[in-house]
């Protein structure tokens, strides 16, 4: 026995395939889909789960063989019809008349338009209630039986794949609520199911069917067809009062509305209507009704010319009535699909949703086309195609920059906004119910306590910032800086007695070299007060102005320290005058900026400078913070210590940081294992405004990353991972090289673009960041060469760095770090170039020279000599030979040449293929010597022409 599929069994039981699959899964059977096959025991188990459905199904087939058409009427005998008679009470008057007189009875009962049109034959057929009388039921019964046999006229109901699914459902509709029989046209506009249901509802009992059959199987089918049924809601056709007009098919205008189908005309009541030829088919073919009453049905339907056509398009019957239109009419589904396709804009052969030009789409940095597609509910592949037609090439998962998204958004009518890093960080923390700003706003005065001011020392390189801090701290940091310039951010806290009270002050030292712009900006961001150091002998310099702009942008009060007043040529008044141009007016000039003249070398006026800082803090700032909460702050600097691992210098801005707290700083996370102050002494807690070194992080955070204490390690890890993914995507988008379609073929042909790959390793993260920014700003004036930093990190050069450099053919730059001995041997063996620097500008100069060396050589034309043609010799073997005399320079064989005549070039980019002195071959011929010159296939040579030879020489790059 063949295995049964789930959907076949579902049809047999009268349930949906989905219900069957669900039920089987509930019963513990593994079923993947409705097309799965199941064994006999499983079939039995499902049948047992639906005993009622199985019984109903069994009963239906039993009744079907007797009379498919009659089964619908449900009352071939008067007995069954009697109980149903009360339901169609309104139709009772019409059926009371005998079959022959049915037309007369139908006329008064049926609607005005239908009554006159209904013929005698159609009357008994269409009237459901009218068919109920026992005598009528008996009369139609034989007709139906006879009709079943002669059904050769057309395919069985339901077998026609082009039918609109009326045939089969109608034949069985009277049996009970059963799904449409197999064979329904899946492309029909969904009339099949409703029809079957209508026959089963109360308004179309099976009783009337027999009566209808009496008049003729086909008419009965037509009349009893689910389509014209009275229950049809919203159908403004005469078919609505069906009960009364049952006896006469003419009462059913639906058939009349059916479209013309010349292939099956049914004249009079002969073929379909009158003849019992289609009893069973009647139900499935509403069109049969009109045919039954040839003349009657058609006029009732609105008088279409070809009355009696048994079959008509279902939409003509149920939709807008009218003859000859159903054949071309499309289903609602098809129309809807066409409308959607028409409304969807197309670009490059794909349809994508468009905005109205004002729709704002927010994307994170480094988003891909897939992310954008999710926002606008589009197919990523379609957006890739659109971008391709706009001249940009990208994959669906490739991180794109803001310009590319702007181009795509403008084309599709969207305004794309790339979320700023600050907003991105805020949205990320919101996912973990952390909102730092709300925490600060919710704090009242009762929980705030005074904290130390954070002071940043800024200024131009070599103006004495670090020496000034040495004087304040009584230490000697300058001696430890390479090249005498600061390349790190240092943070220290001192205690100073001010007005008889000990006050703590936190100092942050920033680099002054131009490469450390990011560090200076970071220092201004975290500070309360800025000390602007200006050398009295140099005056205002570029980095002085930049530091001033950073401080003013951060809205930070500024105290000016005029340093080196002990030096010859010092002119503090000149400095004051210069700074006045930038909005810093000294108090003695009527302004509000405090100027203090100091000498860091001689320790002059250091206390006065500290007092000025504290006075400014007390007057202009509210320096308070809440120490009784989880710590929040910023990582000022970080490095990888060989013995202690990742070490981060953090500044606590609010709350209290304690040993054992779980923190996350940028992409690093971990538990605080130990804390140290600037002197290397261990601390247990760090209060607001306290800089400390933290041990225990998973990796080295970047300088400037915010840090916060989290409830548990899991939260810290998740925040760090999300930050890392966002940073990686942003870096990929930034690194992406945009190549237009116009340049793509050329780039491929030329081996694309020369790239210098670098791996940067440094001792602290801030220095590595500054070095990377400075290197990426190098411009050699040619887009054919680009610089790419494929990896950067903090700590010594490792074996993994060498392996990466080997694969990507990269150069390793070590900044204040060295490789281990084994790593150096591996690099030598693999041929990896490693460079080591301790001063940043030396690294910048070397990389710039390397980039210039990678540039494609530029060539210039250098003239070798000229020759005048005296005579032309014709040769069948070599072509025309120019007998010439060399006027200037040298004529060389295989050199490039051009021919000029009367000052006009007539042949260019030629080659001197043959060069002879008389009959001997020559390599070169000098001035005032005669020679024979052959230019290959170029034969347009006349006497008096000038042959000029030249070569292309490489032009040195400046």
From Swiss-Prot:
Residues 268-325 have a biased composition (Gly residues). It holds the Pfam family EF-G_D2. Residues 326-335 have a biased composition (Basic residues). GO terms for cellular component: cytosol. Residues 563-566 are annotated as: G4. CDD domains: IF2_eIF5B (cd01887), IF2_mtIF2_II (cd03702), mtIF2_IVc (cd03692). Residues 459-466 are annotated as: G1. InterPro entries: EF-G-like_DII (IPR053905), IF2_II (IPR044145), IF2_N (IPR006847), P-loop_NTPase (IPR027417), Small_GTP-bd (IPR005225), T_Tr_GTP-bd_dom (IPR000795), TF_IF2_bacterial-like (IPR000178), TIF_IF2 (IPR015760). Residues 484-488 are annotated as: G2. Residues 75-95, 228-241 have a biased composition (Pro residues). One of the essential components for the initiation of protein synthesis. Protects formylmethionyl-tRNA from spontaneous hydrolysis and promotes its binding to the 30S ribosomal subunits. Also involved in the hydrolysis of GTP during the formation of the 70S ribosomal complex. HAMAP family: IF_2_B. NCBIfam families: IF-2 (TIGR00487), small_GTP (TIGR00231). This is Translation initiation factor IF-2.
